[in-house]
Each structure stands twice: as structure tokens, then as C-alpha cells.
């Protein structure tokens, strides 16, 4: 039977399912490249159909979002269901293979659902349905449980060293692999990223396991502490200063909702002002974003400059970078979330937010290459952009972990999993 005959032989239900999946795949690509500002009309055009025809399959953009997030959670749950973890592996190598295989599966799943994954990092748009809110806030408990089982099996097989908080390590492992879908790594194959990241988490980036007492006294760590002291301690804003007040409100809204879907109307409502008043004070949403991020960028750059310019080993600098990121997370959480979204995709009308990411990558690549040359660092092809991006990702401790175990606990966690690795040496 030819292609035309096969198409005619498909039942109406199969045809509808296939067409819906085509629309969902197209919408996912558009959301991933242009954000949630993509309209139904743009989705219809990309699908080669009229907007009216799209409504035969989905009655709203939210309906598409709901199904995209449902597909993501369903696929991630299937990854957890498919994995067969042996509680007592034959050897440490077998235990490591279990962990790495699961890590790769999570990364592949995340890469295939980037738009839905990114959506779960923010609050749903204003007026979202209860179903969409519930889906966006759903935790990936099944995959965390599967990873925890694999790590516990690794401990039984004498791969994983004792004394680690394995539920926290499991959460970190899963989040690190899920971040592969956030496009920080751009076009790099998910398996390649997962190989580097799981290798670091298991065996550490440091050739020799560093002592925490020595790291606390490093020039890099002390330099970051001095930079953090210069940051303002209070977020209290004088509401009579409308420009400062609007920046404060917009910072929260951009961090909570995401820049792309936050409107001037949303900012005005949150600030208790009229939309016209907001425009008169800030000019445009883009100008407001730039002014918010400029201060954050200057402080972050000062921190990285202090780290990379210190008289310290590469390992000491990476440890200090983790402490910098932990403090950034605590003090500039909204800006941090906005920055992550910007690294995924810079809106074309905003040429720069002030953060010199290419320059940071260049400096870090040189530092990593020097660390490998000095036999302080274990990292394949350290001078590549991918290696630097993987290292930057490892310096970011997930926000929920920082909140759960505190700043110093998060620093110890970073030293345990990033610098030393969880495997016995």
C-alpha cells in the first residue's frame, strides 16, 4: 500500500492523534526559541494551517501548554518506571553504570521537552487554570526516587562513599541532568553533556580531594567574602521613589513569571499604579529589564573578577565561585532566575543585559586549561566552551537545596559533589 493508501487506512482517532502531536511538537519548538509570547496564529502558520483549523485540535494556547507539560511529566515518569536498579550490583563498576545510564536517560528526556521543562521553572501566567498551576508545580518525585535507589545501590557496592546526604545528592543529580533541557548547552548533544556532568558528580573535578579548612582560607574564597560585604543588605524600597519601586516590583514579576510573559499591565497591577504611569516612569519593559539587570550584572562580574583574579589554585577558584553563586542565589534570586532565562534566549530587541557571558566563558576556559596543565583538575578538553558551560552549571546550587540546608550546608554540598565527587577515591 502506498503512502496515500496508508493515510486513508488510518482511523480518524489515529489521524487526530498524529495531527495533535505534530502541532505540539511545532509549538514546543516555537516556545523553546521564542518563549511563551508565541501566539496561536504563529503556531498555526508554522504548522501550515489556518488559525481556525488549529482550534479544531486545541481551544487555547493554555490547552497546548497543559498537554506539553503533561507529556514531559509522563515521559519523565516512564524513564523512572523503565529503569531497573539492582539493589546489590555485582561491582562498583556495575553500580556506576546504573547511575550513569539513568543520568543519560534523564538528560535525553529533558532535551526532548525543553519548552515544557522551562515552563515549570516559573509561575504560570496570570489567570492560568488550576490544572496548569498544578502541573507547573509538580515535583519529579518518581525520577528522584529512582536515582536515590541507584545511589543507595552504589553505596552498597562500595562505589559511593559513606556519610553523604543521598536524598540531597539524588535531587542534585536529577536537577543537573534536567538542566540539559534548558539550552545553556545550546546544540551540544545531551549524551555528551550528561557524560561530562555525571563524571564530575561521581569522581569530582579535583585531582586531589581538598580539605574544607584549606578552602575556607583561600585567597579566592576570602575575595568573594569581601565582594559580598559590599552588597546592600536590605531590599526595603521607598515607595515614594517611583522608579526604584517599579524596578523592585518588576524584578519580582520577571523572576516569578518570566520576562517574556510579564506585561507592563502586570507590573502596574502589582505596583498599584496605572499602566500609563508605569510607561511615563520606565519608558518600556525592555528598558526596565536592562536597568534591573545592570546592577546585578555589575555585582556578579565583580564577584567573578575577584575569583578569577585571585592568587589561588583553580580548585580554590571553583570553590569560591560556588560560594559566590550561593550568595547570589540568596541575595539576587529574582535576577538570577531572569539571568538563566536570558542565557536560554536573548530577546532580539534587547542586545545586552550587561552580563559579559562570552568573556566569562573565555576567561574560565583559560583557567580550566591551566588547572589541567597544573595537574589540579580532571576534565577532558578543558579549553572548550562545553567544558566551561558544564563547570558554570556545576557552580549553581539549586535554589531548593540552598533553602533546605542553608548557605554553608550548600557550600559543603558543592565541595562534596563538585570538587571531590561522591565516589570513593
Where are these predicted regions, by residue range?
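C-terminal peripheral helix-coil segments that are non-catalytic and often amphipathic
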Residues: 1-10, 108, 145, 149-157, ...
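Amphipathic alpha-helical packing segments from all-alpha helical-bundle domains
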Residues: 129-157, 166-170, 174, 178, ...
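C-terminal structured domain segments across diverse proteins
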Residues: 327-424
Amino acid at each position: 500500500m502506498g503512502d496515500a493508501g496508508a493515510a486513508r487506512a488510518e482511523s480518524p482517532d489515529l489521524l487526530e492523534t498524529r495531527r495533535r502531536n505534530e502541532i505540539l511538537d511545532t509549538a514546543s519548538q516555537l516556545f523553546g526559541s521564542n518563549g511563551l509570547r508565541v501566539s496561536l496564529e504563529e503556531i498555526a502558520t508554522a504548522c501550515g494551517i489556518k488559525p481556525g483549523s488549529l482550534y479544531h485540535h486545541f481551544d487555547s494556547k493554555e490547552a497546548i501548554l497543559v498537554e506539553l507539560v503533561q507529556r514531559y511529566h509522563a515521559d519523565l515518569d516512564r524513564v523512572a518506571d523503565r529503569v531497573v536498579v539492582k539493589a546489590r550490583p555485582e561491582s562498583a563498576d556495575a553500580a556506576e553504570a546504573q547511575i550513569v545510564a539513568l543520568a543519560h536517560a534523564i538528560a535525553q528526556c529533558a532535551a526532548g521537552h525543553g519548552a515544557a521543562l522551562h515552563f515549570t521553572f516559573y509561575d504560570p501566567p496570570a489567570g492560568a487554570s488550576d490544572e496548569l498551576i498544578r502541573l507547573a508545580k509538580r515535583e519529579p518525585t518518581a525520577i528522584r526516587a529512582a536515582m536515590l535507589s541507584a545511589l543507595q545501590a552504589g553505596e552498597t557496592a562500595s562505589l559511593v562513599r559513606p556519610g553523604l546526604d543521598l536524598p540531597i545528592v539524588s535531587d542534585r543529580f536529577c536537577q543537573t541532568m534536567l538542566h540539559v533541557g534548558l539550552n545553556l548547552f545550546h546544540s551540544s548533544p545531551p549524551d555528551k553533556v550528561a557524560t561530562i556532568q555525571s563524571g564530575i558528580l561521581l569522581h569530582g573535578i579535583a585531582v586531589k580531594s581538598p580539605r574544607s579548612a584549606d578552602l575556607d582560607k583561600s585567597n579566592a574564597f576570602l575575595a568573594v567574602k569581601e565582594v559580598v560585604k559590599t552588597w546592600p543588605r536590605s531590599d526595603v524600597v521607598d515607595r515614594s521613589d517611583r522608579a526604584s519601586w517599579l524596578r523592585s516590583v518588576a524584578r519580582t514579576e520577571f523572576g516569578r513569571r518570566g520576562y517574556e510573559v510579564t506585561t507592563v499591565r502586570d507590573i502596574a497591577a502589582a505596583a498599584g499604579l496605572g499602566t500609563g504611569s508605569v510607561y511615563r516612569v520606565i519608558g518600556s519593559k525592555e528598558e526596565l529589564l536592562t536597568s534591573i539587570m545592570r546592577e546585578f550584572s555589575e555585582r556578579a562580574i565583580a564577584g567573578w573578577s575577584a575569583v578569577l583574579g585571585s592568587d589561588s589554585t583553580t580548585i580554590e577558584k571553583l570553590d569560591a565561585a560556588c560560594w559566590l553563586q550561593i550568595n547570589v542565589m540568596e541575595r539576587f534570586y529574582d535576577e538570577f532566575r531572569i539571568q538563566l532565562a536570558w542565557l536560554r534566549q536573548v530577546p532580539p530587541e534587547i542586545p545586552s543585559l550587561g552580563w559579559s557571558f562570552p568573556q566569562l566563558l573565555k576567561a574560565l576556559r583559560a583557567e580550566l586549561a591551566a588547572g589541567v596543565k597544573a595537574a589540579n583538575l580532571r576534565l577532558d578538553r578543558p579549553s572548550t566552551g562545553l567544558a566551561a558551560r558544564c563547570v558554570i552549571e556545576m557552580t549553581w546550587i539549586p535554589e531548593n537545596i540552598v533553602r533546605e540546608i542553608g548557605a554553608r550546608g550548600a557550600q559543603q554540598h558543592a565541595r562534596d559533589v563538585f570538587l571531590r565527587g561522591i565516589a570513593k577515591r
